[in-house]
C-alpha cells in the first residue's frame, strides 16, 4: 500500500560544514512512495534538500559499496595505491556471493582493471579484492570504512565492504553525504556510466557485464550504485548534474526495482526544477588584491580558505549579495593568516568563508620605506628603475 510521504526542503549552507549546517524550511512537497527511506542532496554544498526517515539506519545491501568506492579513490589520490598496482585475487574474494564477474583465485589484475567491474556492475569479488589490496584484509578495510564514517560525522556502521552482511547498517542521509564526497572523483563516473561491457579474465575467458542502473541510458544521469536483497528491498543511489549543481537521490528498501528508480527520478526532477547552485569562491582561489600598510610589499592577495557554494531557489538569484569584509592590513603578515571573510546574504540567511593572505609580508625597513617614497615622488611604478639623465 502506498504511503504518502512529506519532505522538507532545506537551503543555504557551506559544503564543508556537515554536522552543523544551518537549516531553513522552504516548502513541503508530497511524494507517493513505498520506500523505507530516502534522501536528496546537492553534492557541492552538501545540502540535504529532502529526506524521509533519513536518520533511521537500514541494511541497504549494495549501497554499502559507496563507502568502499570512496576509500578506493581516496587511496589513489593519496598515493597509497596506484592504478597500475597488481592486485591478487584471494580465495576469500573469489568465493564472494552475490553479483560477481567470477574471478579466479590466484589471478592478478591491475587496480584500474578491477575498478570497472567493481563500479559498473557492483561485482562483490572485485570490490573485495580491491579492499584487501588497500588495507591488507577485508577486516582491516572495514575498520577504515568505520573510521572514515566518523570523520564525516556519520552514525552508520559497516561490517563488510560489499553490503552482503545484514550487520552493515546505514541511513539515507549518511549515504547521501558519502555519495556527495565520492562525487568529487571524476574517475568514479568513468565507470558508473558504462551500460554494457566485457571483462577479460587472465585465462582469456570473458564475462559479460551490465549496469543495473537503468537510468544511465538517459544522459542526464551518471551513476551511482544499486543494491537489493529479499529482506532489505530495492535501493539505489542516483546522480545527475544540472544548473551548476549535482543532485543525488538515495532510495532505501523500495518494493521493486522500478519503484526505486521512479522515486529517484521524481526527487532529482524536483531538485532540477526548483534549485540552482552558485559557486562564490574556490578553495585556494584568489579573491582580491588588497593594500598593505607598513609592509615590504604594497599589496597582497587574499584567498578563500574553503570552497563556498550556495544552493538557491530558482527566481531568487537577484536577492543574493556578496560582501568582502577585511580589516585594514598592516605588516607583518604570515601566509595563511586569516584576515577577513566573504559574507553571502540571501533571503534564507547568511553564510561566510574565511579569507587568508597568500604570502608572507614583512614589516618594511627604513631603506625599503625610503625607496618606496622616492619611487612615489618620481612617479615610478613598483618595477620601474630611475632613469639616468645625461649630463
Predicted regions and their residues:
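Domain-terminus/edge residues, biased toward the C-terminal soluble/receptor-binding domains
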Residues: 150-155, 166-391
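Short alpha-helical segments used as structural interaction elements across diverse proteins
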Residues: 2-3, 62, 257
Amino acid at each position: 500500500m502506498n504511503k504518502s510521504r512529506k519532505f522538507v526542503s532545506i537551503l543555504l549552507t557551506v559544503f564543508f560544514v556537515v554536522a552543523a549546517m544551518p537549516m531553513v524550511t522552504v516548502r513541503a512537497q508530497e511524494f507517493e512512495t513505498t520506500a523505507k527511506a530516502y534522501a536528496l542532496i546537492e553534492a557541492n554544498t552538501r545540502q540535504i534538500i529532502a529526506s524521509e526517515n533519513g536518520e533511521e539506519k537500514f541494511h541497504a545491501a549494495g549501497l554499502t559499496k559507496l563507502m568502499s568506492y570512496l576509500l578506493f579513490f581516496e587511496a589513489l589520490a593519496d598515493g597509497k595505491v596506484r592504478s597500475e598496482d597488481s592486485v591478487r585475487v584471494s580465495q576469500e574474494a573469489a568465493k564472494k556471493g552475490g553479483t560477481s564477474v567470477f574471478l579466479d583465485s590466484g589471478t592478478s589484475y591491475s587496480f584500474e582493471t578491477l575498478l570497472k567491474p567493481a563500479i559498473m556492475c557492483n561485482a562483490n569479488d572485485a570490490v573485495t579484492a580491491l579492499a584487501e589490496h588497500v588495507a591488507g584484509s577485508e577486516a582491516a578495510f572495514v575498520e577504515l570504512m568505520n573510521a572514515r564514517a566518523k570523520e564525516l560525522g556519520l552514525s552508520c556502521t559497516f561490517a563488510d565492504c560489499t553490503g552482503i552482511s545484514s550487520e552493515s547498517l546505514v541511513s539515507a542521509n549518511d549515504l547521501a553525504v558519502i555519495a556527495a564526497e565520492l562525487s568529487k572523483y571524476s574517475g568514479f563516473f568513468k565507470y558508473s556510466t558504462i551500460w554494457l561491457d566485457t571483462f577479460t579474465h587472465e585465462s582469456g575467458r570473458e564475462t559479460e557485464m551490465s549496469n543495473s542502473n537503468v537510468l544511465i541510458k538517459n544522459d542526464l544521469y551518471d551513476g551511482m550504485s544499486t543494491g537489493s536483497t529479499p529482506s532489505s528491498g530495492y535501493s539505489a543511489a542516483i546522480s545527475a548534474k544540472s544548473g551548476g549543481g549535482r543532485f543525488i537521490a538515495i532510495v532505501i528498501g523500495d518494493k521493486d526495482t522500478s519503484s526505486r528508480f521512479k522515486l529517484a527520478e521524481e526527487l532529482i526532477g524536483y531538485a532540477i526544477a526548483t534549485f540552482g547552485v552558485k559557486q562564490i569562491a574556490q578553495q585556494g582561489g584568489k579573491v582580491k588584491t588588497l593594500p598593505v600598510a607598513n609592509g615590504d610589499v604594497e599589496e597582497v592577495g587574499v584567498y578563500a580558505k574553503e570552497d563556498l557554494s550556495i544552493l538557491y531557489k530558482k527566481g531568487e538569484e537577484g536577492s543574493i549579495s556578496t560582501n568582502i569584509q577585511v580589516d585594514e592590513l598592516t605588516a607583518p603578515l604570515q601566509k595563511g593568516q586569516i584576515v577577513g571573510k566573504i559574507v553571502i546574504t540571501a533571503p534564507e540567511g547568511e553564510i561566510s568563508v574565511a579569507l587568508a593572505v597568500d604570502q608572507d609580508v614583512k614589516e618594511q625597513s627604513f631603506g625599503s620605506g625610503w625607496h618606496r617614497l622616492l619611487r612615489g615622488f618620481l612617479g615610478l611604478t613598483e618595477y620601474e628603475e630611475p632613469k639616468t639623465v645625461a649630463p
